[in-house]
UniProtKB/Swiss-Prot annotation:
The gene is lon. Belongs to the peptidase S16 family. This is Lon protease. It holds the Pfam family AAA. It is found in: Cytoplasm. The active site is at S708, K751. The lineage of its organism: Bacteria, Pseudomonadati, Pseudomonadota, Alphaproteobacteria, Hyphomicrobiales.
Length: 810
């Protein structure tokens, strides 16, 4: 059967008479139901319950509801308003319909201009569905109509009076209650009618209203409505109380503002008290403009009220004023962030730093992630490396690339937790901690904060600042960081934290676990030369008031400064020495003795004095018992001389040079290995009991430790016991085992760079360190010959290659 379609569009009202005169062949007209069989046309509704005696608009959803309503209008019949069990169901079917509904008369059928269909219905009587007779094109069912009981017993009357009182109270609590509704409640003809009236207009869920409709017993129904109405009255009372309090608060604030204005006007006329009143007014305005969170603003206004009541001469007046100033001046709101330009970030990093390709690539990756996920929790980078390699300047470059403010917090020597969290205001001279002070200095809540020298914090009786830093660097906690001085939470989650350290040994494990470690190694001589050309000379020219056309420094002179006057992993001393050279030049130009100065290698002795570092390798390796090891230090790699000598004695082993426990064990392991191979090496096994051996590692004032010198110890001992010289162009590193294996060690890049810097041409490295070969700079690889060691036999073959045996000195 086709669905009903009106023949005239835009018609707003269908009456029963008009529908009756519709064309008999209209689509949707089905066979007429027999009223005698209690057959009822069902209009399905969603999320709506109609009660007997109530006139309500009914929204027609879906073709079944529209067809049912139009057929009922055509036949001039009542309909059954029945709610669907699932309001989200598209099609009405017997399976998703409730079984209790209300018989209703259609007072009006409305077709709106937007195409919607509505009925104005008046509920008449409850019914129960006994059987659905049809499903398409509309629902029809055989129903049992339920008569409303007319009881007037005392308990019913008592409930009636109670419910009527509740309804009147609820209507009084509601704003703008229609008078007709009040009159309907007061003139309800019966307890059942009152109950249905209250249920219809009560703020309850459709499910609760359906339960009321299905409750046939009048007492139970009245109790159910009374209970729900009592809950609603309580909600209305609370809402009204909250509204009164809010209005009272606003009225009090307006009254206070008016009184203050009047007081200020009187004071201005008298010429008294202008200063403090103006100060309070300025602070009030500043608090309003600071865009503080509600909790912080409440704390600020509370302190402002205390300040207003306090005499100016009070000692506490200045403390409160300082506290309010801190709250006002902190950046509580988040500024707009410019998008990160990755290409511009690369340009900035390349312009500010030479080399460091892998470090810069990691920073670019970090910035790319920040760009794509600005709300994400980015890792906290920690740059670890020797002094002067550019850790702090990398942080400044990151800030420039992100377009953010940069601020630096020095943690070196901090040993008090209050330096991080601040002092409580009860102490004289209390201030916030370094973190909050840095935020205020930056003036932005999304700044880049450099935590410099994080490895140099120390615990004391005043607490452990390292533990306080755990909260600062934890993305899960720092959004509510609470400084002891402020005593209110401050959001640090948008701060980009970057830490620096020279070494990780002194950084607590939990703190180290919160950071991503990025190691910066020392520069090669070629890299230092390029850095001097591009940055250091230019910076020192500007610092000393010189112009580029007044001074020219040869590359040979710069190389000589690098090798003879500075021996460091970074370039800090190199810049200092270049500054010394240019100050000498500035004197010549300032006194008029020269207008252009050319600095060559030959002039360095005159300008800087004698070289501070000399090549001692050849001299030290001129006797047996001396081997050159390679060491890693916090300031980069270095060469390490191992000296051994022997003398008649009783088999005593002496170790000097401030050797650590691991290094001492390396010497003992090397000597035990030699004893086990004495026959192979040509050493008399009985000579060990008649010989005292002394191993020394200069410089004696510097503590040394680690397993890296095992190979060098072994070669030095073999050299002194066999009288063979070690090649003077060879350095070595590696740990040894009692089986004669050479084990891998760390710091290969720094050690190899140190060997090249010292003028050596061969390095002996553990074969299992081949994976570190790619980390070595290309220019350093080109200068050196690499020998890879599996066993100590490989080390002896390479160290003694081409060297003759000479009598070992006694």
């Amino acid at each position: 059967m086709e669905s009903f379609a009106p023949t005239r569009k835009g018609r707003a009202v269908f009456s029963a008479d008009a529908a009756a005169t519709a064309a008999p062949g209209s689509a949707g007209a089905g066979e007429t139901l027999d009223p005698a069989k209690d057959a009822l046309i069902i209009v399905p509704v969603r999320g709506f319950v109609l009660f007997p005696g109530i006139v309500m608009p009914v929204v027609l959803n879906g073709p079944a509801a529209i067809a049912a309503a139009q057929e009922a209008v055509r036949q001039q019949r009542s309909v059954g308003i029945l709610m669907q069990r699932e309001s989200g169901a598209e099609e009405a079917s017997p399976l998703n319909m409730h079984r209790f509904g209300v018989v209703a008369n259609i007072l009006r059928y409305i077709t709106a201009q937007d195409g919607g269909h509505h009925l104005i219905c008046q509920g008449e009587q409850r019914f129960h569905v006994e059987e659905f007779l049809r499903e398409r094109p509309y629902l029809a069912a055989r129903v049992k109509r339920i008569e409303e009981p007319d009881e007037r017993s005392p308990d019913i009357e008592a409930r009636f009076v109670h419910l009527q009182g509740q309804a009147s109270e609820a209507l009084q609590l509601l704003p703008q209650t229609p008078p007709e509704l009040i009159a309907a409640v007061n003139s309800a003809p019966s307890p059942g009618a009152l109950t249905d009236l209250v249920a219809a207009y009560m703020d309850a869920s459709p499910a609760q209203k359906q339960d009321i409709l299905e409750t046939i017993d009048l007492r139970a129904r009245m109790d159910m409505v009374a209970k729900l109405l009592a809950q609603r009255i309580e909600v209305l009372r609370l809402s009204q109380e909250i509204g009164r309090q809010t209005k009272a608060s606003l009225d009090e604030r307006q009254r206070e503002m008016l009184l203050r204005e009047q007081m200020a006007s009187i004071q201005r006329q008298l010429g008294e008290g202008d200063g403090k009143a103006q100060e309070i007014a300025e602070l009030t305005e500043a608090i309003a403009k600071a865009k503080m969170p509600a909790e912080v603003e409440e704390a600020a206004r509370k302190e402002l009220r205390r300040l207003e009541r306090m005499p100016d001469a009070s000692a506490e007046y200045g403390m409160i004023r300082t506290y309010i100033d801190w709250l006002i001046e902190l950046p509580w709101s988040l500024p707009e962030e410019a998008p990160i330009d990755i290409a511009e970030a690369r340009r900035i990093l390349d312009a500010d730093h030479f080399g460091l390709d892998k470090i810069k690539q990691r920073i670019v990756e970090y910035l790319a992630v920040r760009k794509l996920a600005p709300q994400g929790k980015a890792p906290i980078l920690c740059f670890v490396g020797p002094p002067g390699v550019g850790k702090t300047s990398l942080g400044q470059s990151i800030a420039r690339a992100m377009g953010r403010k940069f601020v630096r917090v020095s943690l070196g020597g901090v040993h008090d937790e209050a330096e991080i969290r601040g002092h409580r205001r009860t102490y004289v001279g209390a201030l916030p901690g370094n973190i909050i002070q840095a935020i205020r200095k930056a003036g932005a809540r999304n700044c880049v904060m450099m935590l410099d020298e994080i490895d140099k914090m120390g615990a004391s009786a005043h607490g452990d600042p390292g533990s306080a830093m755990l909260e600062v660097l934890d993305p899960e906690q720092n959004s509510t960081f609470r400084d002891n001085y402020l005593a209110v939470p401050f959001d640090l989650s948008r701060v980009v934290f970057i830490a620096t350290a020279n070494m990780l040994d002194t950084v607590p494990g939990p703190l180290r676990d919160r950071m991503e470690i990025i190691a910066l190694t020392g520069y090669t001589d070629r890299e230092k030369l390029e850095i001097a050309r591009r940055y250091l000379v230019r910076r020192q020219l500007e610092a000393n008031g010189l112009k580029p056309d007044q001074v020219e420094i040869d590359d040979d002179a710069l190389i000589e400064i690098i090798r003879g006057y500075t021996r460091e992993a970074g370039v800090r001393n190199l810049e200092r020495e270049i500054g010394r050279v240019l100050r000498h030049v500035a004197v010549r130009i300032a006194d008029g003795s020269a207008s252009h100065v050319h600095v060559s290698r030959a002039e360095l002795t005159e300008l800087l004095g004698q070289q501070r570092f000399e090549d001692e390798v050849a001299m030290r390796l001129s006797v047996p018992g001396v081997a050159t090891g390679l060491a890693w230090t916090p300031v980069g790699g270095d060469i390490l001389f191992i000296e051994a000598t022997r003398a008649p004695g009783h088999g005593k082993l002496t170790l000097t040079g401030q050797l650590g426990e691991v290094m001492r064990e390396s010497v003992q392991a090397a000597l035990s290995l030699i004893k086990s191979r004495a026959a192979e090496l040509g050493v008399d096994p009985e000579s060990f009991d008649k010989t005292d051996i002394h191993v020394h590692v200069p410089a004696g004032a510097t503590p040394k430790d680690g397993p890296s010198a095992g190979v060098a110890m072994f070669i030095a001992l073999v050299s002194i016991l066999t009288g063979r010289l070690v090649r003077n162009d060879t350095a070595m590193t590696g740990e040894i085992s009692l089986r004669g294996l050479v084990l891998p060690v760390g710091g290969i890049k720094e050690k190899v760079v140190a060997a090249a810097r010292a003028g050596l041409t061969r390095v002996l490295l553990p074969a299992r360190n081949r994976r570190d070969y790619d980390e070595i700079p290309q220019d350093t690889r080109e200068k050196l010959e690499f020998v890879w060691l599996e066993k100590v036999d490989d080390a002896m073959a390479a160290a003694f290659e081409g060297m003759a045996a000479t009598p070992a000195p006694n």
